[in-house]
Amino acid sequence: DWSSDVCSSDLVAGVITGDMGRSATGEPRAGFQAGYELRARYTIFAEGCRGSLGKQLMAFYRLDEKSDPQHYGIGLKEVWTVDPAQHEEGLVLHTLGWPLGFGTEGGGFLYHAADRQIYLGFIVSLGYQNPHLDPFEEFQRWKQHPRIRRYLEGGERVGYGARAVNKGGLQSLPRLVFPGGLL
């Protein structure tokens, strides 16, 4: 939480953490731990592309008043180690559309890094209309395309992840600094 307790004269001076260990009625339970106040000359809020504190700060300081609306997507990423014969360090592939249907924005990337590593991923706009669309399954289909599959065959996936991503472009970025902090 950030509030008037740590935001005086429009200057953020830290954060206040929430209490932990309260019951549904608000009563302290065993192991209750009270929140604490963390003061700072400058506070960095790094909670991802659509964090709750970030939304509050953008509204309070009107950080997005000169920005276009932001667009979001779900990004899925994997790291593979592949056979040296299938590796072309420095190769970059970008794709658009397929296997997504008409009207669904998205695409993929495949980067050949050092040490036989390939970073690949697929991003689907969160504005898709098909309620049956599964971004993870679309990523799996994308990896079966002959142009992608040939680099992965016989390789081993060594890492993976997913997260929400901003995809509105530079014109959609809010101002990132405000008195006492930054997003």
Q: Which residues fall in each region the model found?
A:
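Short, hydrophobic/aromatic-rich segments at coil-to-beta transitions
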Residues: 11-15, 91-93
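Glycine-/small-residue-rich beta->alpha transition segments that form the dinucleotide
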Residues: 21, 40-52, 126, 145-146
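Core beta-strand elements of the Rossmann-like FAD/NAD(P) dinucleotide-binding domain
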Residues: 25-42, 178-181
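Active-site substrate-recognition segment that forms the wall
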Residues: 95-127, 175-177
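FAD/FMN-dependent oxidoreductases across multiple families
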Residues: 104, 130-131, 135-183
